[in-house]
A protein has these predicted regions:
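N-terminal "arm"/small-domain region of PLP-dependent enzymes with the aminotransferase-like
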Residues: 2-72, 79-82, 283, 289, ...
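Hydrophobic "anchor" residues on beta-strands that sit immediately upstream
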Residues: 176, 209, 241
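Active-site PLP attachment segment
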Residues: 229-272, 276
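Structural signature of PLP-dependent enzymes
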Residues: 274-292, 299-328
Length: 398
């Protein structure tokens, strides 16, 4: 008998599996609104000018490709800290933030989860309902029980504030609470600053450990604006975790450029925490890759390239906002049987469209338009060339 005779076929990843189905579809004119990737107006992945300039300089320097330190490139880690906490952050001045380069946002989450399992082995993890599909899998793989807290209100297309606060308060003390710092995935519905303050009050009262996930900084309202929750928590006195990613904001998806940041109580404590996080990394992938983080570090630490990148990020953010507004206008003009005005109020790359699983299936079968079964669509995949096709198809399946 084979060692693998009892191995069962794993279910397809709901997002990446959708991409596989899309690639296998031979119909011309098919449209993929499922994958979480920013496409430009021409329907292509952009190669940012700031990234091209940084890569050109790196190639011309003929830099050696030795092993990086376990925690990654120092200039990269410092650039991440300033982007998240602000260049004038007291926490940074006091040495109270530990940042390590990670293999994408996913690697940052898993490293943080593995470290937390050593600190709080009996803790419960809570994620929003709904949340990014991999949040549950990552924390369950680290050995934690995972449950949901209420977040999205389908009736209002907004936040279920009362349910959110009630569920956070009902969690066992010292639970680990995963929060989307901005551009909530999959709903596009974010907390207001007043909401954040109320959430913070509950977390402090219950002794919960916040784990902020920020994969879309700059895609909501701006780089500093989208870091507002992180900076609010930085003033709270709490210890907390932040996972961050540059896949979207630098269009470096395949380079897996992320970071884990941990807020401590002192410089001395930071040293001990860093030593333990490095042990986790060493037993997972030893040390991170060089190229993507080198590019990001060069851009963040060069005033000229930083300004160029911020302009390009602003263009991407503006195009998504334009597509949201155009989608709402097109659906209304085509006589859609419901009001989609809420789509224009959402933030980031995604929209919780309100489409049912059956309607999403019809979009795929009848029109070759792929979306996630929950009704999540990637607004960043829309453009002036496919918007009319998409909105007409949505109108027909309602």
């Amino acid at each position: 008998m084979s060692l693998f005779s009892a191995v069962e076929m794993a279910p397809r990843d709901p997002i990446l599996g959708l991409n596989e189905a899309f690639n296998a579809d031979t119909r011309p004119g098919k449209i993929n609104l499922g994958v979480g990737v920013y496409y430009n107006e021409e329907g292509r992945l952009p190669l940012l000018r700031a990234v091209q300039a940084a890569e050109k300089a790196r190639i011309e320097a003929h830099a050696p490709r030795g092993y990086l330190p376990i925690e990654g490139i120092a200039a990269y880690d410092q650039g991440v800290q300033k982007l998240l906490f602000g260049a004038d952050s007291e926490l940074l001045a006091e040495g109270r933030v530990v940042t390590t380069q990670a293999v994408g946002g996913t690697g940052a989450l898993k490293t943080g989860a593995d470290f937390l399992k050593r600190l709080l082995p009996n803790a419960t993890v809570a994620i929003s309902d709904p949340s990014w599909e991999n949040h549950r899998a990552l924390f369950e793989a680290a050995g934690f029980p995972v449950q949901n807290y209420r977040y999205y209100d389908a009736a209002t297309h907004g936040v279920n504030r009362a349910g959110l606060l009630e569920d956070l308060n009902a969690l066992p003390s010292q639970s680990i609470v995963v929060l989307h710092a901005c551009c909530h995935n999959p709903t596009g519905v974010d907390l207001s600053m007043d909401d954040w303050r109320q959430v913070l009050d509950v977390l402090k009262a219950k002794g919960h450990v916040p784990f902020l996930d920020i994969a879309y900084q700059g895609f909501g309202d701006g780089i500093d604006e989208d870091a507002a929750a992180v900076r609010l928590f930085a003033k709270s006195g709490l210890n907390f975790f932040v996972s961050s990613s540059f896949s979207k904001s630098f269009s470096l998806y395949g380079e897996r450029v992320g970071a884990l940041s941990v807020v401590t109580n002192s410089r001395e404590e930071s040293g001990r925490v860093l030593s333990q996080v490095k042990r986790v990394i060493r037993t997972n992938y030893s040390n991170p890759p060089t190229h993507g983080a080198s590019v990001v570090a060069s851009v963040l630490n060069s005033p000229e390239l930083r300004a160029m990148w911020e302009d390009e990020l602003g263009e991407m953010r503006g195009r998504i906002r334009t597509m949201r507004e155009a989608m709402v206008a097109q659906l209304a003009a085509q006589g859609a049987k419901r009001d989609f005005g809420f789509v224009a109020q959402q933030r980031g790359m995604f929209s919780y469209s309100g489409l049912t699983a059956e309607q999403v299936e019809r979009l795929k079968d009848e029109f070759g338009i792929y979306a996630v079964g929950t009704g999540r669509i990637c607004v960043a995949a829309l453009n002036n060339g496919n918007l009319d096709t998409v909105t007409r198809a949505i109108t027909q399946v309602l």
